[in-house]
Amino acid sequence: FNAVEGNTTFYARPAPATVARWAQVMPEHFRFTAKFPRDISHEGDLRDQLEPAFDFTRLMAPLGRRVAPYWLQLQASFGPARLAELDQFLQQIGVPVAVEVRHPAFFAKGEEERALNRLLHACGVERVCLDPRALFSCTSRDPAVLHAQAKKPKVPPRPAAFSQHPQVRFIGHPQLEANEPFLTPWVEKVGAWIEEGRSPYIFLHTSDNRLSAALAQRFHQRLMQRLPGLAALPELPRAPEVEQLGLL
């Protein structure tokens, strides 16, 4: 795989030595979508968080272009009345950013959602598309499933391509075959984006992420059928989770 969601930075800033180690082991082509820490995205006016945000981007600077884009995940209480804050933050931050929103008004197909999309499009900023439908179709009482359903917002997918790099988070069903009908529209959408010359970022999860790699391989195999000539994924190492834990 050639990209990973940087969820760890949402909860805690890495030490400079950790960032230096990441810079040593990450290939130049690898992409790390580092999330702004939650004290930046979830506490107070975004305009007041610009200096901490600059500090964070300076911390991550040793990774260079491998951090692209940064993700700004906004809480569900961040609504249309605060778009002016978001606009100023995006105008001044100075690094590639993608934004994930969770307020219901931004999924209502009304003027408030259109205003958000206009703002992001004007800034060349992607709207992160979360698709949790497969997860919420699951009726299992497994604790991992229930935990994931409690954490993820039940929002409709909003595919967007405001730049060369559309961003998709697909939260899957724990039974791989149950994801097929939910993956089908994404195979077509992602295939069309690639044909347009875009390079989408597609992140696939399962409730406990043990099958995430298998789900990603399944999706890529279908994408290869949609796009003849698309290169196959390299074979996974036997214990990828151990390597990733060492990285993070």
Regions found by a protein language model. Give the residues of each.
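Residues lining hydrophobic/aromatic ligand-binding pockets adjacent to catalytic sites
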Residues: 1-248
